């Protein structure tokens, strides 16, 4: 494999050298002054008028991270730790945002909420998605329950899939081959295969996107240690995205997708019930259909996002399980702009989740909501709103947000001070309430309160710097509690006291000189009261990207994860995990006809030995070679 990498790298370097005289006319500008953000208001507003420090992952950044998973890419952003993203491909993922957990993170795909009612945390599994099908991602941190409802307590991850080309027919192909080895494995054989096909186009008023992707990965065992078997992971993605513009005022979009993952897992076999290298398996299938009509009128629009999701999951182990779940979501909302300063949205969100345990269980949400954004001529901006959560099990709960900011001129850019106070409501999942082994129907709903204060200086390409302090309180946090370790009896319970989390986040982005861009972020998270595992107090990421020519660029990324604690389930005691640092490398070249691109990335260059989860493997130095073809 090393010889293949060396030959590939030499070829691409030669092509890049032939074009080195080209002027870099389109440098990778990190942030533009006219950058538009949507997720925090549902309106396309300039970044300077937003009261949040929103994370945007562009199409260009996604291209530079080919060979990685969507979880790995999101994991490089401030305030976010996606635990399990550096382990075996099929490892379950934990979303830690500002000290929270999976149940407090909401995922949107093309503006439509997605979740799995059968999951413990009612969350969406990012392993189901292929990064090559994604156009861009926006992430807002902090409670956003007013606009997005139950579960949007620490973050909303808004994912937009690839859009149709203006051409009648456009075809793109991608293929990636790579290794998948631990730090102790010197046999760097090709064991990671990732392929994608996308056909799209526009025929007058009709647009279409049809995509297919598959991944097959082996070479690494979930359980760490010697003489362990390889645990394979495979994924199939198919998606279709259709649009029709009936008139200038009315358009309709229809979405459909089928995603399936199969992976070998290691578990806790009888009679000792301690983690070991086993032959367990897991299969998960998701079928999703959505429709999104929109009608525009003078100064406003009426839209609907409606979806049906069917998910089947099966685990084959000493603790076998089969889950069948369905999710229904309808969000109808009216947007209206008063002049050019006041943006309003009024909506109603219906959600129904159902899962089959010993019998079918279900709950519903019926939530009216309203939100307004005021953008003044003198720099004051205000985002405020409220939602009445009407839950079939927990009655009515009012959540609200208040988010002022002040923007002023700063040289050729702007400065901004911001603050926010927001609340959120999180009902226990169907699993936590009704599972026959661990469920507890007497659980109370969780309530969150989030306070933020920060600033942002933005000078366009040259510099963007932001800092933010956050303070979160969790009441009635749902915990998995071991009641009787000797007999392996556990149940979900509510925490007796409040969990209090605070921290700071810093981000910087700068074009050091033409073609050379630098980004970095640092997060400090402190848990004052409560209990969290696998949550580092200190995290940092950095990226140095150099665009050698219009068609060639290279990047080096760095990630630091501080020490943290994890639970050793053989002793039910918490133990400390050491801090670690990872460095990755990327090099890509687009050929002159713009039809072919070759790239290479090397992850964990220095083969750092570390643990994400006690007893589980992590990836060592690995290589990925890939190509993109556009026709």
What function would you assign to each model-found segment?
Residues 22, 217-329:
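Flexible loop and strand-edge segments within Gram-negative outer membrane beta-barrel domains
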Residues 247, 292, 339-345, 351-474, ...:
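Structural signature of Gram-negative outer-membrane beta-barrels, strongest in the C-terminal barrel
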Residues 35-65, 94:
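N-terminal periplasmic "start-of-domain" segments of outer-membrane beta-barrel proteins
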Residues 133-135, 149-158, 164-223, 232-238:
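Outer-membrane beta-barrel translocator/receptor signature
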